[in-house]
């Protein structure tokens, strides 16, 4: 019986998906494209989350977000990851550094609609 339990335990351990450690990310203003969903969920004011053409901006990740006028709400950000800690720096104007556990992220920016300057068709 003990042998059977040990064999079953070994099979479960061998078949378990390995826990993948996230690679460290040096500070950058341009995170990898495959990480944009993550970063733009928690740092939604960052300029790399928005595509602006002729002063009109669309969120690159969140299709349900409103189209907005390019304005000071969109900021330059630097993101990084080191030993499981993700951080984003809102600067140089705000000089605010946010840190969070990469596995348990929290947003520090909020879509304050009054600051977003939502684009309306009547603006043409």
UniProtKB/Swiss-Prot annotation:
- Tell me the leader sequence span: 1-16
Q: Does the keyword Nucleotidyltransferase apply?
A: no
Q: Which UniProt keywords apply?
A: Glycoprotein, Signal
According to the record, glycans are attached at: 76, 94
Q: Which cysteines are joined by disulfide bonds?
A: none
Asked whether the UniProt record includes tRNA-binding among its keywords, one would answer no
Highest taxon above the source species: Viruses
Q: What does this protein do?
A: Plays a role in virus cell tropism, and may be required for efficient virus replication in macrophages.
Question: Which family is annotated?
Answer: Belongs to the asfivirus MGF 110 family.
The protein, known as? Protein MGF 110-8L
